């Protein structure tokens, strides 16, 4: 409990440091529960002492009442648009114009990613965030200050005390975009066409609490008004990052066209692997004195350009719309497309989410549509181009029976479900999910193998996986001695799996990884015996989740007990046992090759109470290393962080009562 103002200030600084490590460095220093506990203590102190609240306290991010409309804010200096180039020839022509107007060729160019989101202008005064506004017309934008304060990667306070504008892009990560669209589709709400629209729409919410739920990030790309004297663009950005903003994954200084093109190709290759959308890279003349010499057109500066990637959105035609049955019985319509290449990948199918979405967008077979693809995000139809209709397009009927088993479906309006638990599609997809990486992670049990096992009658249920015999597998096409033995070994190796992984693998509707952990922490392996009123005691469990558990257990109780007998899942360690672990509350880092996969070791360490992070800092307690350790080993040596071999890690885990 915080007793006085000094302790309060120390707690606020600690929260700010932890939040910076989590949201900006992507390297959490403490577990969520430690952060949450101190956050609540700070909140309580602020309620008792409202006159002492630090405006940069993380608690001040959310709290503003919903606005009736957005006010206007005039930018201190103009927010310019940017010229685009789309290929090497156009880039060459832009460079030639720059060289000609600058009167010299010995120039350097500062390169940074072009994030695909919503532009935002932040004004800081006396070290505090004074306002945040959208680009608007470049002169005047909309006041979204309350919303910007909910974005954790935007500092509420900076070290610099002068008046300054810091500009950047608000983005949503690809996986969060996919989840957001999925949730909206389930609720019957319109989905966002792409991550850029999702970021812009989330930033322009009248209620800041809605913005806070959208998991937005802010990447700075320039300084507007300022009284500082920078000589180079890269110095400007170094200054910005020193104030606590996120650095991009890559930035560089190039000296000629060849280096710029090489970097462009590197950006293109890494684009799909990144958590956020890029639509190109920005090339700026690094020497700021040249900016005024090169000047501006009516629309954009002549000293910078966006070197754009090929589009991730393409036009194509829907050939057919077919229904697919998932593991929970939900029937999802999928568009079969005329093949179209997007970023080097041929796209032939795209999700349509649900039949309510088809009706809302009036999607028909034969329509010309816009399709988006981004990295791991499933290709999606975002827009119907009705101007291309000929009158031959066909409307899509909502299915009355399951397309796989032929049984009548339950039509809930937004969702349509097959309720037949023995439906082949439901069974196969349940087994695929059960064996998947995020569940039991049974090696060698992919989609093709599961379908083969089901078609040959060897597996009709997840329980059958643990009854497989090598002689049966050897009769299957593609199975030789080694492959058959590997699959048997893989199914047996999951014995002793953690309770929460077992629960998560069952595929109970609305019960994911987080809820599975909470269930097991509260009830252990007896989770399925817990009465309804006890389930409601778990934080975050509402009627929908409780009903899902009840309905699942009612139908599958015998199967749950059989699987517990076969798998012998491990009970979660009690809090007092974790406290006695030599690894309790230790921040650790792994480097090098070890005898088990990194994900498995991370789980074991977390069960022992450790917090596993991705990079080494002064706050790291141990770095455990295996064969061929990487740069983290050298970083630990430089910082004086204890380096322990893999064998020592296993000793500490054993001491904590954790067996591999």
UniProtKB/Swiss-Prot annotation:
It holds the Pfam family DNA_ligase_aden. Its EC number is 6.5.1.2. Its cofactor is Mg(2+); Mn(2+). Keywords: DNA damage, DNA repair, DNA replication, Ligase, Magnesium, Manganese, Metal-binding, NAD, Zinc. NAD(+) binds at residues 32-36, 81-82, 112, 135, 169, 284, 308. It catalyses: NAD(+) + (deoxyribonucleotide)n-3'-hydroxyl + 5'-phospho-(deoxyribonucleotide)m = (deoxyribonucleotide)n+m + AMP + beta-nicotinamide D-nucleotide. The active site is at residue 114. One of its GO terms (molecular function) is DNA binding. One of its GO terms (cellular component) is cytosol. It comes from the Bacteria. SUPFAM superfamilies: BRCT domain, DNA ligase/mRNA capping enzyme, catalytic domain, Nucleic acid-binding proteins, RuvA domain 2-like. Residues 578-660 form the BRCT domain. Zn(2+) binds at residues 402, 405, 418, 423. One of its GO terms (biological process) is DNA replication. Gene3D superfamilies: 5' to 3' exonuclease, C-terminal subdomain, BRCT domain, DNA ligase/mRNA capping enzyme, Helix hairpin bin, Nucleic acid-binding proteins. HAMAP family: DNA_ligase_A (MF_01588). Belongs to the NAD-dependent DNA ligase family. LigA subfamily. NCBIfam families: dnlj, PRK07956.1. DNA ligase that catalyzes the formation of phosphodiester linkages between 5'-phosphoryl and 3'-hydroxyl groups in double-stranded DNA using NAD as a coenzyme and as the energy source for the reaction. It is essential for DNA replication and repair of damaged DNA. This is DNA ligase. The gene is ligA.
């Amino acid at each position: 409990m915080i007793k006085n103002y000094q302790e309060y200030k120390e707690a606020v600084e600690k929260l700010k440091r932890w939040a910076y490590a989590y949201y900006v460095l992507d390297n959490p220093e403490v577990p969520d529960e430690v952060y949450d506990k101190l956050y609540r203590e700070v909140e309580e102190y602020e309620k008792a002492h409202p006159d002492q609240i630090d405006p940069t306290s993380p608690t001040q991010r959310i709290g503003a009442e919903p606005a009736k409309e957005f006010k206007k804010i005039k930018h201190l200096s103009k927010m310019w648009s940017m010229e685009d180039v789309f290929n090497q020839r156009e880039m060459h022509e832009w460079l030639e114009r720059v060289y000609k107007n600058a009167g010299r060729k010995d120039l350097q160019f500062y390169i940074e990613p072009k994030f695909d989101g919503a532009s935002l202008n932040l004004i800081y005064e006396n070290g505090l965030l004074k306002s945040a506004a959208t680009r608007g017309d470049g002169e005047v934008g909309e006041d979204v200050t309350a919303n910007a304060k909910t974005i954790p990667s935007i500092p509420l306070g900076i070290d610099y005390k002068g008046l300054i504008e810091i500009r950047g892009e608000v983005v949503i990560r690809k996986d969060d975009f996919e989840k957001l669209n999925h949730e909206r589709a389930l609720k019957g709400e319109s989905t966002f066409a792409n991550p850029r629209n999702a970021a812009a729409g989330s930033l322009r919410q009248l209620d800041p609490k809605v913005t806070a739920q959208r998991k937005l990030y802010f990447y700075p790309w320039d300084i507007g008004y300022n009284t500082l004297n920078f000589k180079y663009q890269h110095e400007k950005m170094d200054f910005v990052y020193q104030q606590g903003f996120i650095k991009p994954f890559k930035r560089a200084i190039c000296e000629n066209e060849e280096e710029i093109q090489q970097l462009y190709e590197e950006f293109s290759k890494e684009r799909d692997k990144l958590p956020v959308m890029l639509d190109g890279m920005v090339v700026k003349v690094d020497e700021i004195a040249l900016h005024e010499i090169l000047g501006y057109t009516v629309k954009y500066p002549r000293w910078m350009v966006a070197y754009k990637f090929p589009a991730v959105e393409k036009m194509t035609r829907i050939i057919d719309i077919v229904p697919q049955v998932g593991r929970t019985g939900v029937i999802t319509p999928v568009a079969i497309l005329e093949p179209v290449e997007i970023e080097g990948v041929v796209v032939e199918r795209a999700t349509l989410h649900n039949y309510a979405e088809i009706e809302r967008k009036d999607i028909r077979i034969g329509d010309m549509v816009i399709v988006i693809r981004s990295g791991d995000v499933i290709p999606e139809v975002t827009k119907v181009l009705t101007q291309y209709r000929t009158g031959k397009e066909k409307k899509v009927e909502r299915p009355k029976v399951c397309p796989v088993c032929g049984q009548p479906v339950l039509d809930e309006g937004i969702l349509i479900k097959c309720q037949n638990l023995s439906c082949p599609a439901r069974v196969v997809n349940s087994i695929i999910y059960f064996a998947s990486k995020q569940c039991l992670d049974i090696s060698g049990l992919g989609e093709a193998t599961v379908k083969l096992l089901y078609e040959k009658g060897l597996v009709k249920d997840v329980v059958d996986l643990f009854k497989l015999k090598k002689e049966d597998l050897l009769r299957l096409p593609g199975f030789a001695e080694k492959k058959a033995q590997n699959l048997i070994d893989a199914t047996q190796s999951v014995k002793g799996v953690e309770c929460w992984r077992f629960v998560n693998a069952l595929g109970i509707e609305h019960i994911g990884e987080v809820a599975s952990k909470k269930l097991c922490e509260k009830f252990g392996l007896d989770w399925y015996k817990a009465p309804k009123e006890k389930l409601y005691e778990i934080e975050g469990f509402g009627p929908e989740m409780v009903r899902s558990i009840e309905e699942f257990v009612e139908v599958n109780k015998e199967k749950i007990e059989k699987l517990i007998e076969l798998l012998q899942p491990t009970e979660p360690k009690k809090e007092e046992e974790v406290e006695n672990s030599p690894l309790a509350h230790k921040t650790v880092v792994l480097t090098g090759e070890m005898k088990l996969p990194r994900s498995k070791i991370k789980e074991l360490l977390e069960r022992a109470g450790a917090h596993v992070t991705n990079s080494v800092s002064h706050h790291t307690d141990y770095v455990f290393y295996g064969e061929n350790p990487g740069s983290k080993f050298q970083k630990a040596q430089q910082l004086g962080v204890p380096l322990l071999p893999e064998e020592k890690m296993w000793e500490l885990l054993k001491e904590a009562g954790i067996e591999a």
